[in-house]
Amino acid sequence: MIYRANKPEEAIKSQINKEKHGIDFVDAQNLWRDENALIIPANIVDEEIRYALISKFQNKCYIAIFTLRSDIYRIISVRRCRKNEEKNYEKDNGPRV
């Protein structure tokens, strides 16, 4: 399970993310379907490890910040990749020799 809006504030946060970055947390779940997605540790907040997922959805590169709680990926935010983040994605998924 990736995203559940169990609490009203989760649905609100998803809507705010869509208004700000053009993608809500429901659509963002598709980022985990990309076989070429990169997951890297991002930082630690209040002893909780946060990860960055760099992935493509509808031919656009996104970065999702998330954490794992009780076997559920809790999405914190999602936005379009910056140029250097997209280059890292492309570099890691470039042609294989």
Model-assigned labels for residue ranges:
Residues 1-97:
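Ribonuclease/tRNase effector modules and their secretory precursors
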